[in-house]
Amino acid sequence: MQQKTDVILIGAGIMSATLGSLLKELAPEWEIKVFEKLASAGEESSNEWNNAGTGHSALCELNYTSEKADGSIDISKAVKVNEQFQLSRQFWAYLVKSKLIRNPQDFIMPLPHMSLVQGKKNVEFLKNRFEALSKNPLFQGMEFSDAPETLKKWLPLIMEGRTSNEPMAATKIDSGTDVNFGALTRMLFDYLKTKNVELNYKHSVENIKRTKNGLWEVKVHDMNSGKIEHHTAKFVFIGGGGGSLPLLQKTGIPESKHIGGFPVSGLFMVCKNQKVVEQHHAKVYGKAKVGAPPMSVPHLDTRYIDNKKALLFGPFAGFSPKFLKTGSNLDLIGSVKPNNVLTMLAAGVKEMGLTKYLIQQVMLSHEKRMLDFPAFIPNAKSEDWDIVVAGQRVQVIKDTDAGGKGTLQFGTEVVSAADGSIAALLGASPGASTAVHVMLEVLEKCFPSRMIEWEEKIKEMIPSYGISLTENPRLFQDLHTSTGRTLGLNEKETVHN
């Protein structure tokens, strides 16, 4: 028997949670069903231990600002990422203000974001970056210093025991955040439950196919009872993290062809000495080694997990053929199809450097990983640190005009059918931080005829929707202050509601 509904969301992560929340505000009468393979929400890529928890707004991530041939800095990508994070901030503030979610300090905390570099050339790059960003209102309040005494105040743990005379510099901005995406995801699904969204955990989606009358039929395995169910919907969103690509391929839509996925696993070192944890209070991003991929940017992060302060260092990359942490070793080989095999092979040839890098990373022992610490913590002791396996990220491989056949993509990407009846989210960073922007893109692609009708409500929830904050500094200032107040970020006050 087929069970009909309006919307099916596959995967109970931050993306489905965000899209479901937007739809329930815009079209409250629509029936929504969620299917999640695991036992609860936010357990894969959205889980707090499976991602870096950075509110990515390009305040400290150096890979969002590239150096041009003439030495000037291109800040366009940084501005774009920051603008996108502001949309998330505004939507979260709307949810808190409307009492749809409570206690924002359980998912977002104010935390300085810093960039740290060593060596004369890198110091020059950071100074140029600081000067370029400082002209933009989104980055106001950023400070730069190459004075050792200032760096000792900003970064006591990092500067302690440092003997090298090599030039160092840092930038610091206090408006950064640490975001617990696992906690936020669980809050959003708790809210959706009150809106009669049907949440089905331990339900694995086995197949997706088009019916004769233009609906989508989703075949679901109920892992609790062992039964197979068939559900139909007018619109399906595939938000299954690394598991999205295999499901997208099952749809057979033309847009799913010539796309591959390359899985990369991440490892972090977590500090178990609370005295060391208390000596650091920032997210500090360094610069990737020459030739290393963007996902290898080292960072030392204060995190707030279960309302307790933690300290993580990494990431160290790894390789596993699984597309999900809880996936199968056959995921990668199973994703190779006649329509994408040449794309995948081309990427294999192009990305020999990445493959070599990942093999080297996999071979690292605990003690070898500790050798990466002196750049960040000269006095780090091996016994103070344990390894934590983070989530899998599946980088998109596709044919592009700029990069040619088999080009590895490092962002997130929405793939949708021409008629807007189904969409999938592929890719990785900046991911969760830009969830609201990405899900608005899904709405624009899949419900174009409803956008005029929905615009007023969208602007009530997300006031800067469709507006450049860079070009409207006054609006940015007003929204930054008001959302900061609602989310408890302006001062470290606790918001109870």
From Swiss-Prot:
Q: Which UniProt keywords apply?
A: FAD, Flavoprotein, Oxidoreductase, Tricarboxylic acid cycle
Q: Which cofactor does it need?
A: FAD
What SUPFAM superfamilies does the annotation carry?
A: FAD/NAD(P)-binding domain
Keyword Nucleotide-binding listed? The answer is: no
- Gene Ontology BP annotations: tricarboxylic acid cycle
- Ranges in a coiled coil: none
Q: Pathway, per UniProt? A: Carbohydrate metabolism; tricarboxylic acid cycle; oxaloacetate from (S)-malate (quinone route): step 1/1
Q: Name one GO cellular component term.
A: cytoplasm
Which EC number(s) are documented for this chain? Answer: 1.1.5.4
Q: Name one GO molecular function term.
A: L-malate dehydrogenase (quinone) activity
Catalytic activity annotated for this protein? (S)-malate + a quinone = a quinol + oxaloacetate
Identify its protein family: Belongs to the MQO family.
Protein name as catalogued: Probable malate:quinone oxidoreductase
